[in-house]
Amino acid sequence: MRLAIGGMVAGMAATGFAGRARAADSKTGVTPDQALDKLRQGNLRFMSEPQACVADLAQARQRVAEGQAPWASVLTCADSRVAPELVFGGLGPGDIFVCRNAGNIADTVVLGTLEYGVIALGSPLIMVIGHARCGAVAAACDVVIKKQKFPGSIGPMLKPILPAALAVAQKSGDVIDLAIRENARRQAEHVMSSSSIIAKAVKAGKVKIVAAYYSLDDGKVEILS
C-alpha cells in the first residue's frame, strides 16, 4: 500500500495536476451525459439479461495494464449485494472508478479519491448510489428514533448519515427507505459543497454529479437527482 500511494503521489507531482487533467480529458472521450447514458443502458442490460453481464477479464486486463481512463466514478455501499460493475451491465477493469464504504458516505477519503478521479483520470460523472435495505442507514435510523447506541467505531461511522435519518424521521411510509434515498442525495450534495475541485469541474460542464437508488429486488438503478 505504501509503495502504491507513494507512486501515485510521485506521479502527480512529476506531471502536475493540470497536465494530468488535460491528458485525462482526451483519454475518456466521454461527456457527463454520455457517461450517465452508458450506466443507464448497462443497468437495463443487467435487469433484462443478467446472464450476459460477464466481462472478458483477460482482454480487459491487458487493455488497461498500462493506464486507466474510467468514464464514471461511483460511490456506493460496501454491502456485498451491491456490485457496481455487475449492476451496470458487466463492466470490466478500467471502466469505472469505484469507492465503497458502509452507507456510501462521502468522507475525506472518498472526497480525495473522487477528486483524483476528476483531476488525474478525467472521469466525467460521479454517481452516489444508495440501496434498498441498507444496514448502515437502518442503524442510523435506530440511533435517531430508538436512541440506540452501537459499539466500537460503528457509532462514529454513522454520524454522517444521521442528518438524513433526522430529515425523514417524522414522515409517513418506510422511514428507512426514505432515509436511504435522502442520504444518497445529501452525500451527492456534500461532494459538490465540500470539494472546490469538483465544484469547479461541475460549473465548467466537465463533470456531473447524480444521486441514485439501487433496488435489490429487481436490479433497477433509479436516478434521484
Name every feature range the model reports, one short phrase each.
Residues 1-21:
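N-terminal export signals
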Residues 15-48, 52-56:
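C-terminal segment of N-terminal export signals and the immediately downstream linker at the start
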Residues 32, 83-174, 180, 186, ...:
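Short HxH-centered metal-ligating active-site micro-motif
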Residues 39, 74, 99, 128, ...:
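Divalent metal-coordination and catalytic microenvironments
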Residues 53-93:
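N-terminal short beta-loop-beta anion/metal-coordinating cradle
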Residues 68-71, 93-96, 121-125, 204-205, ...:
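Short coil/turn connectors at secondary-structure junctions
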Residues 170-210:
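Charged, glycine-interspersed solvent-exposed loop segments at helix/strand-loop junctions
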Residues 203-223:
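GST superfamily/GST-like fold recognition
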